[in-house]
């Protein structure tokens, strides 16, 4: 199982991204689900449509319809955790998309600290709730 950030998804879906083939190969080999925050999904959809066009967006929507990707639910408990993260790491200006992605990877809900992202700045600075560090893909392969 991998929690996905916008930058990693863009590499996977945008044919113009140089990292795309390696990311797609890694994701195709992944046995577990890909989990996406609804905030990441909204951010990603906008960027994908404006950068790669309608065909790329249709691929995303068809993947979502066939359960290739799982869209996580944002709960009131997540909102409280996000507020604490944003406050604790105020200097990073995390935003809700990154904060919720970190919560999904740090909570027991999905049992993973693996995140598909190229955002080293935010995801290296923040520590999972259970301690340790996030495993950032593809950097930590």
Residue ranges and their predicted role:
Residues 29-31, 67, 92:
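Structured helix-beta-strand junction loops
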């Amino acid at each position: 199982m991998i929690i996905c950030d916008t930058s990693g998804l863009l590499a996977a879906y945008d044919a113009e991204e140089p990292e795309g083939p390696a990311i797609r190969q890694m994701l195709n080999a992944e046995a577990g689900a890909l989990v996406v925050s609804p905030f990441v999904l909204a951010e990603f959809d906008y960027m994908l449509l404006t950068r790669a066009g309608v065909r790329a967006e249709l691929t995303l929507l068809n993947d979502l319809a066939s359960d290739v990707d799982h869209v996580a639910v944002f709960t009131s408990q997540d909102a409280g955790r996000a507020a604490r993260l944003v406050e604790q790491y105020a200097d990073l200006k995390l935003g809700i998309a990154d904060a919720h992605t970190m919560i999904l990877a740090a909570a027991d809900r999905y049992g993973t600290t693996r995140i598909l992202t190229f955002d080293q700045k935010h995801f290296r600075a923040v520590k999972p709730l259970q301690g340790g560090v996030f495993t950032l893909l593809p950097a930590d392969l």
